[in-house]
């Protein structure tokens, strides 16, 4: 069974929701309310010591970070593959994913965090 620890306002979580939908996988969802600082709850920090969302738990093992979660899902459930087989195309996909994670997501994260403290 899959359990996804989420926060719906998180753009990183949205990426994982899309991957799960593309794979047609069912999962349990656990809301981690960042507005209420639930990411710092000791129980959640046992699952993800960095205190971020999303985190996927599968077979008792936690996978943090949205891009890693998406790759894990694609490799674990190979039906309807999302990652190309061709090494060059795979490297381009990872390059784009890294660009999004390090620029777009980082910018939206900073904006979101600034709104939390208003």
Feature-to-residue mapping (PLM):
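GST-like domain detector, emphasizing the conserved glutathione-binding G-site
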Residues: 1-116
């Amino acid at each position: 069974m899959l359990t996804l620890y989420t926060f719906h306002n998180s753009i990183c979580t949205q990426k994982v929701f899309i991957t799960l939908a593309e794979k047609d996988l069912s999962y349990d969802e656990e809301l981690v309310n960042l507005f209420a600082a639930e990411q710092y709850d000791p129980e959640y920090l046992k699952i993800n010591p960095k205190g971020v969302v999303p985190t996927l738990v599968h077979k008792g093992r936690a996978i943090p970070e949205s891009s890693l979660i998406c790759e894990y899902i694609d490799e674990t459930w190979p039906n309807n593959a999302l990652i190309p087989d061709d090494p060059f195309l795979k490297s381009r996909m990872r390059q784009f994913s890294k660009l999004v994670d390090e620029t777009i997501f980082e910018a939206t994260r900073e904006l979101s965090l600034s709104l939390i403290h208003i």
